[in-house]
Amino acid sequence: MERILENAMYASRWLLAPIYFGLSLGLLALALKFFQEVIHVLPNVFALSEADLILVILSLIDMSLVGGLLVMVMISGYENFVSQLDIDDSKEKLNWLGKMDSSSLKMKVAASIVAISSIHLLRVFMDAQNISTDYLMWYVIIHMTFVVSAFCMGYLDKVTKH
């Protein structure tokens, strides 16, 4: 009975595979939205103010960071919790494949969240004259919460590894 239960629990990790595949569909949706934004802005690039162009570029950078986060979570999560990727040696291989454990994945996710939050905060500050002080204050508080959380996670990770 114990063996059957253990084998069933171990096999249940494959339930994560469609979830990680779903993230790839999310990445596809993000790529479509990225190029929709590029196609939308290119014909109007000369009519945009410098501030508006910077906001569009920040939005594109934000999408690229989210895309990188999706790839990292999708591939590392699959490798850590489901199965190793069998990538042919003749194909291009990411140098971090097989090297990122769940702890380093958490740190990279935390750093990505801080970077994404920073871009959002910069976008808010670029339009600060149209935004209430309370909204700005809460945005900074939330961002600092992400920063402090990432710092604490890194510190705890360093302390537990030594």
Curated annotation (Swiss-Prot):
Which Gene Ontology cellular component terms are annotated? plasma membrane
Q: Which UniProt keywords apply?
A: Cell membrane, Membrane, Transmembrane, Transmembrane helix
- What are the annotated disulfide bridges? none
**UniProt cross-references to Pfam families, sorted A to Z:** UPF0114 (PF03350)
Superkingdom field: Bacteria
Please tell me where this protein is predominantly located. membrane
Give compartment(s).
Cell membrane
Name the protein family. Belongs to the UPF0114 family.
| Protein name, UniProt field | UPF0114 protein PputW619_4503
Q: Which organism is it from?
A: Pseudomonas putida (strain W619)
